């Protein structure tokens, strides 16, 4: 496992972790922006992180039969973790605003399912995946992600999240910006 510092360095070098002043899709402002697609677009660098995350998942979950990844962010990491753990991996996608299984994907009854995401912030997508698992009468093995940037206040997930790295990403309403963030012009272009 890479050190926290080296992990952050990889995320910064791949532009998966940016620092500055950003307006997030929620409308909140933040000095950090995370885009795991940038990490995953460089497989030779993402490989180290994926292998370490797969080891953590294997250590923390006794039984996983299937990996379910919400589209679009979870697809690549779901595939990589599935490959490393030798587990079938499927994804769900939105149709009329709700996650559904398409493309011939299904979840067998009593299957133990791991939900795999790139980043977990509020857990909303993960909890929508839980509905699909329950509807299929399968079992939730747990939750995993490359980055856990959740905070207790906004998190919908009540179970432990296994992540490669936990990053504190403070957010602020536009009328409550700290002085140092007010001085930096903000960017929308990463959304």
Where are these regions (language model features)?
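PRPP-associated nucleotide enzymes
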Residues: 1-191
């Amino acid at each position: 496992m890479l050190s926290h510092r080296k992990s952050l360095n990889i995320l910064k070098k791949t532009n998966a972790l940016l620092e500055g002043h950003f307006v997030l899709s929620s409308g909140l402002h933040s000095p950090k922006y995370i885009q795991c697609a940038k990490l995953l677009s460089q497989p030779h660098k993402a490989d180290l992180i994926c292998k370490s995350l797969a080891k953590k998942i294997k250590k923390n979950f006794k039984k996983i039969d299937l990996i379910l990844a919400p589209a679009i962010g979870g697809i690549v990491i779901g595939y990589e973790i599935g490959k490393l753990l030798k587990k079938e991996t499927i994804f769900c996608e939105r149709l009329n605003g709700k996650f559904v299984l398409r493309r011939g994907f299904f979840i067998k009854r009593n299957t133990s399912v791991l939900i795999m995401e790139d980043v977990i912030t509020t857990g909303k997508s993960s909890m929508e995946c839980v509905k699909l698992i329950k509807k299929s009468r399968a079992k939730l093995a747990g939750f995993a992600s490359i980055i856990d940037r959740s905070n207790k206040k906004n998190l919908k997930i009540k179970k432990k999240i296994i992540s490669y790295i936990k990053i504190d990403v403070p957010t602020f309403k536009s009328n409550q910006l700290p002085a140092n963030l007010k001085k930096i012009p903000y960017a929308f272009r990463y959304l």
